[in-house]
């Protein structure tokens, strides 16, 4: 909010907080996250990132996770990949079941963006990421697998922060009647997040604008 206001007026984050308090505005609470861990069902990769969520160029470090949404028709699952260079969501898939086919569709999108790069792809120890099929996709495309330690959300906080923003800004406090309505909202938000939502860590630019400027 602070950076959005700075587009038209000079203001700092403390004043924004005071104005929100005066107006009675509060941040929305987070709900319990989807847990994909089902024990060790396959190979557990080393933690290559060790909470270093910084990158010096696109396609150097990626992170992924799955989160759950609900509407009147049932549950919907989002599986995205985030580039840690500019926080851009470079690939994602929405499905009504968090299955291997969802991960495969997401990876197909991500691989199309590699352009010869060999990134690290970091995740938790969810069963999807332990599957030999997933690990084969990474290996065949020169992607290094990295996994968080079990039961510590701080080791994938970069993706958790995106989920928190998404749900706070377009999901919490709203009722969705159909899958179609919820899917449309998520598609539109991810486009907005990538192309328009400015971030302090990106010098007040959106992820796509930051990447574009860095490559010029």
Curated annotation (Swiss-Prot):
UniProt organism field: Haemophilus influenzae (strain ATCC 51907 / DSM 11121 / KW20 / Rd)
Span of domain Integrase catalytic: 54-215
Xref: Pfam families: rve, rve_2
Keywords noted in UniProt: DNA recombination, DNA-binding, Transposable element, Transposition
Protein name per UniProt: Uncharacterized transposase-like protein HI_1721
UniProt-listed PANTHER family: TRANSPOSASE INSF FOR INSERTION SEQUENCE IS3B-RELATED, TRANSPOSASE INSO FOR INSERTION SEQUENCE ELEMENT IS911B-RELATED
GO terms, biological process: DNA integration; DNA recombination; transposition
Family under the similarity heading: Belongs to the transposase IS3/IS150/IS904 family.
Molecular function GO labels: DNA binding
